[in-house]
């Protein structure tokens, strides 16, 4: 049996890569849910990955609508430090737009910190945790429901 040293585990890209996949799935789900809820109202909105946060939703004038932090770590439910950093980042941006929403996406139920105005993301049917496999299933279901939008023809 081969063992991996703690140094190799720390430097491994496996956790980071799966984190990027989870982040992307959460971004796609969020965008699809917004389109399903109000396709005309979000026309021109943008999904920005790895900008202000793990991902952000920007309106048609590039103003931040919401910030999203994503964590997919098995067994971990305590993220107070990450939540506090997210609040500081949001507070530094609210002078431009005071109504920025903040959401935390996770594969586990997270102990949220009161007073930070960061909400666990509502995935489906009130659930506030969702793993990658279930995310893919929800996304697949939403792609069948989302209305087609008219976009300029690209050559």
Question: Which residues are covered by each model-predicted region?
Answer:
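Acidic metal-coordinating catalytic centers involved in nucleic-acid phosphodiester chemistry
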Residues: 1-18, 71-155
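Catalytic centers of nucleases
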Residues: 16-17, 23-91
């Amino acid at each position: 049996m081969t063992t991996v040293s703690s140094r190799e585990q720390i430097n491994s890209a496996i956790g980071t890569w799966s984190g990027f996949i989870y982040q992307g799935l959460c971004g796609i789900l969020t965008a699809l849910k917004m389109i399903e809820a109000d396709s005309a109202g979000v026309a021109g909105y943008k999904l920005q990955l790895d900008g202000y946060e793990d991902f952000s939703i920007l309106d048609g004038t590039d103003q931040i609508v919401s910030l999203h932090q994503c964590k997919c770590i098995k067994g971990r439910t305590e993220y107070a430090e990450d939540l506090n950093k997210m609040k500081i980042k949001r507070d530094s941006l609210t002078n431009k737009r005071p109504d920025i929403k903040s959401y935390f996406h996770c594969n586990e139920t997270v102990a949220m910190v009161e007073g930070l105005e960061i909400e666990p993301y509502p995935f489906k049917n009130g659930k506030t945790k969702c793993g990658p496999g279930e995310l893919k299933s929800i996304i697949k279901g939403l792609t069948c429901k989302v209305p087609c939008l008219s976009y300029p023809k690209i050559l």
